[in-house]
A protein has these predicted regions:
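Charge-rich, low-complexity N-terminal segments
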Residues: 2-170
Length: 170
């Protein structure tokens, strides 16, 4: 039988127009900071695994719904990496202040996505979205047949980062 020794024989791919977000960001590390700029990010998901008794690896509708909820939290925000080793970040009242060397940004808190990442790169955004989606699926006991998940985050046409992790279902 083809694939008899493999955990995953099927995969689903979700790449819908509404799985996008527009956000500002800048990359900063010691000795370097990009100018603040933005992207129209596009997110896609690949899920690998076995078929359930209902004929699904994972329901497309659930993947779309949960991913959409995640990207909505990032849409029209300035992404700030809360775990940065070179940014000083303060949240006071309704403002977020971000400082790097001599530069200082004061932003309305409602317009900031303060994320548990070190850099606001497409790579770390892909891992962040993967982690959030995995947490939501785990909470719903929806990972029984899933052996791997992959998230891609495109900053523009032909330019994307991918984060993939194996899950090894029971």
């Amino acid at each position: 039988m083809a694939g008899a020794n493999r955990v995953s024989d099927f995969s689903i791919h979700v790449a819908k127009e509404n799985l996008k977000f527009s956000a500002a960001h800048f990359i900063a590390y010691p000795g370097f900071r990009e100018p603040l700029h933005g992207h129209n990010y596009q997110v896609a998901i690949k899920v690998e695994g076995r078929l359930s008794t209902t004929g699904y690896v994972l329901d497309f509708g659930l993947v779309k719904k949960l991913t959409r909820e995640i990207v909505e939290r990032l849409d029209e925000r300035t992404i700030i990496p809360a775990q940065s080793d070179c940014l000083t970040i303060h949240e006071i009242d309704s403002q977020v202040t971000v400082a790097y060397e001599g530069d200082r940004f004061v932003l309305p808190a409602s317009g900031v996505a303060l994320l548990p990442i070190s850099h606001s790169s497409a790579e770390e955004l892909a891992r962040f979205i993967w982690t959030e989606l995995h947490r939501e699926l785990l909470h719903r006991n929806s990972l029984e047949n899933v052996s791997a998940m992959e998230i891609s985050v495109a900053e523009g046409p032909g330019q994307m980062a991918i984060y993939r992790q194996e899950l090894f279902p029971g």
